[in-house]
Protein backbone atom coordinates (compact mmCIF):
# COMPACT_ATOMS: atom_id res chain seq x y z
CA UNK A 1 0.00 0.00 0.00
CA UNK A 2 1.36 3.38 -0.94
CA UNK A 3 2.11 5.82 1.82
CA UNK A 4 2.16 9.50 1.01
CA UNK A 5 4.97 11.09 2.98
CA UNK A 6 5.43 14.80 3.50
CA UNK A 7 8.21 16.72 5.14
CA UNK A 8 5.99 17.24 8.16
CA UNK A 9 5.93 13.50 8.80
CA UNK A 10 9.69 13.24 8.45
CA UNK A 11 10.20 16.05 10.94
CA UNK A 12 8.05 14.26 13.50
CA UNK A 13 10.50 11.36 13.63
CA UNK A 14 13.18 13.71 14.92
CA UNK A 15 11.05 15.48 17.51
CA UNK A 16 10.84 14.71 21.19
CA UNK A 17 8.93 11.73 22.53
CA UNK A 18 6.00 14.02 23.29
CA UNK A 19 5.42 14.40 19.54
CA UNK A 20 3.61 11.16 18.75
CA UNK A 21 1.40 10.30 15.77
CA UNK A 22 -2.19 11.22 16.51
CA UNK A 23 -3.80 8.94 13.97
CA UNK A 24 -3.71 6.87 10.81
CA UNK A 25 -6.16 6.59 7.91
CA UNK A 26 -6.12 3.81 5.32
CA UNK A 27 -7.87 4.44 2.02
CA UNK A 28 -8.37 2.19 -1.02
CA UNK A 29 -10.55 2.13 -4.11
CA UNK A 30 -11.29 4.07 -7.28
CA UNK A 31 -8.45 4.62 -9.74
CA UNK A 32 -10.37 7.61 -11.08
CA UNK A 33 -10.05 9.17 -7.64
CA UNK A 34 -6.47 8.08 -6.92
CA UNK A 35 -4.67 11.34 -7.77
CA UNK A 36 -7.45 13.37 -6.14
CA UNK A 37 -7.26 11.31 -2.95
CA UNK A 38 -3.47 11.56 -2.88
CA UNK A 39 -3.67 15.34 -3.19
CA UNK A 40 -6.27 15.55 -0.43
CA UNK A 41 -4.14 13.35 1.82
CA UNK A 42 -0.98 15.34 1.16
CA UNK A 43 -2.65 18.65 1.92
CA UNK A 44 -4.35 17.33 5.05
CA UNK A 45 -1.12 15.85 6.42
CA UNK A 46 0.72 19.11 5.78
CA UNK A 47 -1.86 20.82 8.00
CA UNK A 48 -1.95 18.05 10.60
CA UNK A 49 1.51 16.78 11.54
CA UNK A 50 1.28 13.38 13.15
CA UNK A 51 -1.47 12.07 10.89
CA UNK A 52 -0.44 9.34 8.44
CA UNK A 53 -2.70 8.67 5.45
CA UNK A 54 -2.14 5.65 3.22
CA UNK A 55 -3.75 5.75 -0.24
CA UNK A 56 -4.12 2.88 -2.71
CA UNK A 57 -6.03 2.41 -5.98
CA UNK A 58 -7.09 -0.92 -7.43
CA UNK A 59 -10.64 -0.03 -8.42
CA UNK A 60 -13.92 0.57 -6.61
CA UNK A 61 -14.73 -3.13 -6.24
CA UNK A 62 -11.36 -3.85 -4.63
CA UNK A 63 -11.88 -0.92 -2.28
CA UNK A 64 -15.29 -2.17 -1.20
CA UNK A 65 -13.88 -5.63 -0.48
CA UNK A 66 -11.12 -4.12 1.67
CA UNK A 67 -13.67 -1.98 3.50
CA UNK A 68 -15.86 -4.98 4.28
CA UNK A 69 -12.87 -6.99 5.50
CA UNK A 70 -11.80 -4.14 7.76
CA UNK A 71 -8.48 -3.55 6.01
CA UNK A 72 -9.21 0.12 5.28
CA UNK A 73 -11.09 2.98 6.91
CA UNK A 74 -12.37 4.58 3.71
CA UNK A 75 -13.29 3.17 0.31
CA UNK A 76 -13.14 5.66 -2.55
CA UNK A 77 -15.78 4.90 -5.18
CA UNK A 78 -16.87 6.28 -8.54
CA UNK A 79 -20.25 4.54 -8.28
CA UNK A 80 -22.81 3.52 -5.70
CA UNK A 81 -22.69 0.19 -3.91
CA UNK A 82 -24.28 -2.68 -5.81
CA UNK A 83 -26.85 -4.90 -4.03
CA UNK A 84 -24.34 -7.66 -3.22
CA UNK A 85 -21.89 -5.18 -1.71
CA UNK A 86 -24.62 -3.54 0.33
CA UNK A 87 -25.74 -6.94 1.64
CA UNK A 88 -22.19 -7.88 2.59
CA UNK A 89 -21.76 -4.64 4.52
CA UNK A 90 -25.04 -5.22 6.33
CA UNK A 91 -24.11 -8.83 7.13
CA UNK A 92 -20.72 -7.84 8.56
CA UNK A 93 -21.59 -4.60 10.34
CA UNK A 94 -25.34 -4.63 10.84
CA UNK A 95 -25.82 -1.56 8.65
CA UNK A 96 -25.06 -0.20 5.21
CA UNK A 97 -22.31 1.99 6.61
CA UNK A 98 -21.99 5.65 5.64
CA UNK A 99 -21.35 7.35 2.35
CA UNK A 100 -20.21 10.87 1.59
CA UNK A 101 -20.38 12.73 -1.71
CA UNK A 102 -17.03 14.50 -1.97
CA UNK A 103 -16.89 15.77 -5.56
CA UNK A 104 -18.57 15.71 -8.93
CA UNK A 105 -16.97 14.33 -12.07
CA UNK A 106 -17.60 14.63 -15.77
CA UNK A 107 -16.90 11.25 -17.33
CA UNK A 108 -14.77 12.32 -20.27
CA UNK A 109 -14.31 10.56 -23.58
CA UNK A 110 -10.60 10.49 -24.38
CA UNK A 111 -9.29 10.62 -27.94
CA UNK A 112 -5.88 11.31 -29.41
CA UNK A 113 -5.29 15.05 -30.02
CA UNK A 114 -4.45 14.28 -33.68
CA UNK A 115 -7.82 12.61 -34.29
CA UNK A 116 -9.96 14.72 -36.65
CA UNK A 117 -13.16 13.78 -34.82
CA UNK A 118 -13.75 16.15 -31.91
CA UNK A 119 -17.48 15.74 -31.26
CA UNK A 120 -19.41 12.49 -30.77
CA UNK A 121 -23.12 12.04 -30.14
CA UNK A 122 -24.31 9.95 -27.20
CA UNK A 123 -25.93 7.55 -29.67
CA UNK A 124 -22.72 7.10 -31.65
CA UNK A 125 -20.73 6.70 -28.45
CA UNK A 126 -22.88 3.73 -27.53
CA UNK A 127 -22.44 2.27 -31.01
CA UNK A 128 -18.65 2.60 -30.80
CA UNK A 129 -18.38 0.65 -27.57
CA UNK A 130 -20.84 -2.04 -28.71
CA UNK A 131 -19.09 -2.57 -32.09
CA UNK A 132 -21.91 -1.10 -34.18
CA UNK A 133 -19.57 1.64 -35.42
CA UNK A 134 -16.07 0.37 -36.15
CA UNK A 135 -14.47 2.95 -38.47
CA UNK A 136 -13.72 6.62 -37.87
CA UNK A 137 -14.96 7.51 -41.36
CA UNK A 138 -18.49 6.73 -40.14
CA UNK A 139 -18.06 9.72 -37.82
CA UNK A 140 -16.48 12.03 -40.40
CA UNK A 141 -12.89 11.05 -39.65
CA UNK A 142 -10.21 9.12 -41.49
CA UNK A 143 -10.72 5.66 -42.94
CA UNK A 144 -9.27 3.84 -39.93
CA UNK A 145 -10.46 1.18 -37.53
CA UNK A 146 -11.68 2.48 -34.18
CA UNK A 147 -9.83 0.96 -31.22
CA UNK A 148 -12.09 1.16 -28.15
CA UNK A 149 -10.47 0.85 -24.74
CA UNK A 150 -12.42 -0.13 -21.65
CA UNK A 151 -11.59 -0.62 -17.98
CA UNK A 152 -11.53 -3.88 -16.06
CA UNK A 153 -14.78 -5.08 -14.41
CA UNK A 154 -13.45 -4.18 -10.94
CA UNK A 155 -13.66 -0.53 -11.95
CA UNK A 156 -16.60 1.63 -10.94
CA UNK A 157 -16.11 3.56 -14.17
CA UNK A 158 -16.58 0.33 -16.14
CA UNK A 159 -20.01 -0.24 -14.60
CA UNK A 160 -21.07 3.40 -14.72
CA UNK A 161 -20.32 3.65 -18.43
CA UNK A 162 -22.00 0.31 -19.14
CA UNK A 163 -25.16 1.35 -17.31
CA UNK A 164 -25.48 4.98 -18.38
CA UNK A 165 -24.05 4.93 -21.91
CA UNK A 166 -24.53 1.37 -23.13
CA UNK A 167 -27.91 0.89 -21.41
CA UNK A 168 -26.40 -2.27 -19.89
CA UNK A 169 -25.58 -3.80 -23.26
CA UNK A 170 -22.32 -5.73 -23.49
CA UNK A 171 -19.08 -4.02 -24.38
CA UNK A 172 -17.52 -4.70 -27.75
CA UNK A 173 -15.66 -8.04 -27.38
CA UNK A 174 -12.68 -6.72 -29.35
CA UNK A 175 -12.13 -3.75 -27.03
CA UNK A 176 -8.75 -3.44 -25.36
CA UNK A 177 -8.83 -3.70 -21.57
CA UNK A 178 -6.79 -1.30 -19.42
CA UNK A 179 -6.18 -1.75 -15.71
CA UNK A 180 -6.14 1.95 -14.80
CA UNK A 181 -7.17 5.31 -16.21
CA UNK A 182 -3.50 6.13 -16.70
CA UNK A 183 -3.14 2.99 -18.84
CA UNK A 184 -6.09 4.12 -20.97
CA UNK A 185 -4.39 7.47 -21.56
CA UNK A 186 -1.03 5.88 -22.40
CA UNK A 187 -2.63 3.73 -25.11
CA UNK A 188 -4.53 6.66 -26.62
CA UNK A 189 -1.45 8.88 -26.53
CA UNK A 190 0.38 6.34 -28.71
CA UNK A 191 -2.50 5.47 -31.05
CA UNK A 192 -4.38 8.06 -33.07
CA UNK A 193 -7.35 5.73 -33.61
CA UNK A 194 -7.96 4.74 -29.98
CA UNK A 195 -10.80 5.97 -27.80
CA UNK A 196 -11.47 5.49 -24.11
CA UNK A 197 -13.09 7.09 -21.10
CA UNK A 198 -12.29 8.29 -17.59
CA UNK A 199 -12.48 11.20 -15.19
CA UNK A 200 -12.26 14.84 -16.21
CA UNK A 201 -9.32 15.33 -13.85
CA UNK A 202 -6.94 13.54 -16.21
CA UNK A 203 -5.99 16.24 -18.70
CA UNK A 204 -2.54 15.34 -20.03
CA UNK A 205 -1.83 13.73 -23.42
CA UNK A 206 -5.45 13.29 -24.54
CA UNK A 207 -8.27 15.40 -25.96
CA UNK A 208 -11.57 15.37 -24.08
CA UNK A 209 -14.18 14.99 -26.82
CA UNK A 210 -17.34 17.05 -26.97
CA UNK A 211 -20.44 14.93 -26.40
CA UNK A 212 -23.60 16.09 -28.17
CA UNK A 213 -21.71 19.34 -28.94
CA UNK A 214 -21.11 19.98 -25.22
CA UNK A 215 -17.63 20.33 -23.76
CA UNK A 216 -16.78 18.45 -20.55
CA UNK A 217 -16.05 21.43 -18.29
CA UNK A 218 -16.53 22.33 -14.65
CA UNK A 219 -19.52 24.58 -15.31
CA UNK A 220 -21.19 22.17 -17.73
CA UNK A 221 -20.77 19.30 -15.28
CA UNK A 222 -21.97 21.28 -12.26
CA UNK A 223 -25.22 22.32 -13.97
CA UNK A 224 -25.64 18.90 -15.67
CA UNK A 225 -25.48 20.38 -19.17
CA UNK A 226 -22.77 17.87 -20.01
CA UNK A 227 -24.59 14.53 -20.44
CA UNK A 228 -22.20 12.23 -18.52
CA UNK A 229 -21.75 13.37 -14.93
CA UNK A 230 -21.48 11.46 -11.67
CA UNK A 231 -20.63 11.95 -8.02
CA UNK A 232 -17.50 10.59 -6.37
CA UNK A 233 -17.89 8.93 -2.98
CA UNK A 234 -16.19 8.06 0.27
CA UNK A 235 -17.68 4.95 1.92
CA UNK A 236 -17.10 3.93 5.53
CA UNK A 237 -18.31 0.77 7.26
CA UNK A 238 -19.66 2.73 10.24
CA UNK A 239 -20.12 6.28 11.44
CA UNK A 240 -16.61 7.72 11.27
CA UNK A 241 -14.91 9.06 14.37
CA UNK A 242 -11.55 10.44 15.40
CA UNK A 243 -9.02 11.20 12.69
CA UNK A 244 -11.15 9.52 9.98
CA UNK A 245 -14.06 11.86 10.75
CA UNK A 246 -11.74 14.85 10.93
CA UNK A 247 -10.28 14.05 7.53
CA UNK A 248 -13.68 13.60 5.88
CA UNK A 249 -14.99 16.80 7.46
CA UNK A 250 -11.98 18.67 6.09
CA UNK A 251 -12.46 17.20 2.59
CA UNK A 252 -16.02 18.56 2.62
CA UNK A 253 -14.91 21.97 3.89
CA UNK A 254 -14.12 24.89 1.55
CA UNK A 255 -10.40 24.20 1.99
CA UNK A 256 -10.80 20.56 1.01
CA UNK A 257 -13.02 21.46 -1.93
CA UNK A 258 -10.33 23.81 -3.21
CA UNK A 259 -8.08 20.75 -3.52
CA UNK A 260 -10.89 18.97 -5.40
CA UNK A 261 -10.94 21.83 -7.88
CA UNK A 262 -7.14 21.94 -8.11
CA UNK A 263 -7.16 18.23 -8.99
CA UNK A 264 -9.40 18.98 -11.98
CA UNK A 265 -12.68 17.72 -10.53
CA UNK A 266 -15.82 19.68 -9.71
CA UNK A 267 -16.35 20.93 -6.14
CA UNK A 268 -19.73 20.32 -4.55
CA UNK A 269 -20.38 24.05 -4.62
CA UNK A 270 -18.90 27.15 -6.22
CA UNK A 271 -15.86 28.39 -4.34
CA UNK A 272 -14.68 31.93 -3.71
CA UNK A 273 -10.90 32.33 -3.63
Residue ranges of each PLM-predicted region?
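Sec-dependent N-terminal signal peptides
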Residues: 4-13
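Exported/periplasmic ABC-transporter solute-binding proteins
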Residues: 15-273
